[in-house]
Amino acid sequence: MAERPGSPGSREMRLLTFRDIAIEFSLEEWQCLDCAQQNLYRDVMLENYRNLVSLGIADSKPDLITCLEQNKEAWNIKRNEMVAKHPVTCSHFTQDLHPEQGIKHSLQKVIPRTYGKCGHENLQFKKCCKSVGECEVHKGGYNEVKQCLSNTQNKIFQTHKCVIVFGKFSNCNRHETRYTGKKHFKCKKYGKSFCMPSHLNQHQIIHTKEKSYKCEECGKSFKRSSNCTTHKRIHTGEKPYRCEECGKAFRWPSNLTRHKRIHTGEKPYTCEECGQAFRRSSTLTNHKRIHTGERPYKCEECGKAFSVSSTLNDHKRIHTGEKPYTCEECGRAFNCSSTLKTHKRIHTGEKPYKCEECDKAFKRHSSLAKHKIIHTGEKPYKSK
């Protein structure tokens, strides 16, 4: 549906299609993306298509979506010509923003996106710089520009050397919604309103607990394809994040970051009560319960409470009789991993607990504590 041409303020108004918001790459462009950027691209395109489906706009499934769902390379799909020939302006901004002439096949130059018309003129933004904050030409108006673009789609173009902010919008009302902050998209179930249909879609996923991405191996479902991809490493054994110091590999980058602190000695989490420092925030949280006396983990069988969930899990095995930790040396089984670890010292002869007074070493910390009484003369057990 379009207004009559020639009248003041005439503008093209039509339904948004997936082709309007699709971003497509050549082989050269696709190879410029690292693995994380390619995964992000897939997530964004699939999310955009789901948004159109939820609004009843999408017709037949595009080849690009079929390709992405099958994890095929996106550049196999023929690209559309999406380059404006003339400088364009937006009525919300005073300066002209010119698209680059002679676009090269590289993400570090310009990858345009096309939408339709907004107001009197098309709307395009393009500026290359090291980061969004360093965008000199658009520094004053960037916050407004940012409102006019999908946050998830912007992420794709934040490459190492170049930030591309590029777009047109097919609907002036859609553009003004982002600009003014008006919320036209309402959740029928809870009444909450959103500026963008994608935000409404994300909200609906939360309260419907929809999980679209399923692991074929174990059946576990996830809200994001990236989370499903990461989860699959449990089954495949893939550990792509390797420590340069010792060669140990990890499934997740966060685990590698924590591991590196072993080499650096960094302990960024400090207890305000006693000053003891820890490598992990979770360890600090558990430690604080020593001072507060909090024991939030309670055994339903006997009522005994614990400060750490793992200790409760170990305790429960007393009731069930389960002993999942077996010594490979002698076959003896234990109900918790720490007990097995201590037991193994019988076979290895390891004695990690050393007395500072006489250098005598022990397999158990409790044995060292008892030994120290010899030096202190302390008599903890009084006869009645």
Swiss-Prot record:
Nucleus found in the keyword field: yes
Keyword flag Ribosomal protein: no
GO biological process: regulation of DNA-templated transcription
UniProt cross-references to InterPro entries, sorted A to Z: C2H2-ZF_Transcription_Reg, KRAB, KRAB_dom_sf, Znf_C2H2_sf, Znf_C2H2_type
Domain named KRAB: residues: 16-87
Highest taxon, organism lineage: Eukaryota
Coarse class of the protein's main subcellular location: nucleus
Keyword set, alphabetical order: DNA-binding, Metal-binding, Nucleus, Repeat, Transcription, Transcription regulation, Zinc, Zinc-finger
Gene Ontology CC entries for this record: nucleus
Entry GO MF terms: DNA-binding transcription factor activity, RNA polymerase II-specific; RNA polymerase II cis-regulatory region sequence-specific DNA binding; zinc ion binding
Gene3D superfamilies recorded: 6.10.140.140, Classic Zinc Finger
Zinc finger (C2H2-type): 185-207, 213-235, 241-263, 269-291, 297-319, 325-347, 353-375
Subcellular location: Nucleus
PANTHER family associated with the record: ODD-SKIPPED - RELATED, ZINC FINGER PROTEIN 208-LIKE
Family designation: Belongs to the krueppel C2H2-type zinc-finger protein family.
Function: May be involved in transcriptional regulation.
Protein name stated in the entry: Zinc finger protein 722
Species name: Homo sapiens (Human)
